[in-house]
C-alpha cells in the first residue's frame, strides 16, 4: 500500500478532494487504520491523532466514513467498495478525466 500510495497515486495531501486526484476505495473497510496511517504519513492527519482511532469523539472510525475529506465512499462489507470503485472509474471515463481509481479488496 505504501508503494501504491506514495509512488503511484497522484494526489495533493493538502487538498484530498482535488477533482484530478486519484481515488482509493478501501473495500475492506476494516482496514481503515491503514488508510489513516497513509494520510498521516502524507501530512494530512497529525500523527498524534492516530491514537484517537475508534474513540467515540473521533472521526477516525473503524471503517472509512465520507465525513473525512479523503474518503469518497463508506465501506464495510467485503466487496461493497468494488462497485463504488467501478462507478468512479466509469465516471472518469465519462467526464474525460485522467484520475485513476484503485480498490483494495479481500
Mark where each language-model region is:
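Cofactor-binding active-site loop characterized by glycine-rich and histidine/acidic residues
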Residues: 1-106
Amino acid at each position: 500500500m505504501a508503494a501504491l500510495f506514495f509512488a503511484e497515486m497522484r494526489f495533493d495531501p493538502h487538498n484530498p478532494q482535488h477533482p484530478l486526484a486519484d481515488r482509493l476505495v478501501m473495500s475492506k473497510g476494516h482496514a481503515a487504520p491503514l488508510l489513516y496511517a497513509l494520510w498521516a504519513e502524507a501530512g494530512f492527519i497529525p500523527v498524534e491523532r492516530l491514537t484517537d482511532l475508534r474513540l467515540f469523539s473521533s472521526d477516525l472510525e473503524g471503517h472509512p466514513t465520507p465525513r473525512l475529506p479523503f474518503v469518497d465512499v463508506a465501506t464495510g462489507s467485503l466487496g461493497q467498495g468494488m462497485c463504488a470503485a467501478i462507478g468512479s472509474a466509469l465516471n472518469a471515463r465519462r467526464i474525460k478525466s485522467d484520475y485513476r481509481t484503485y480498490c483494495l479488496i479481500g
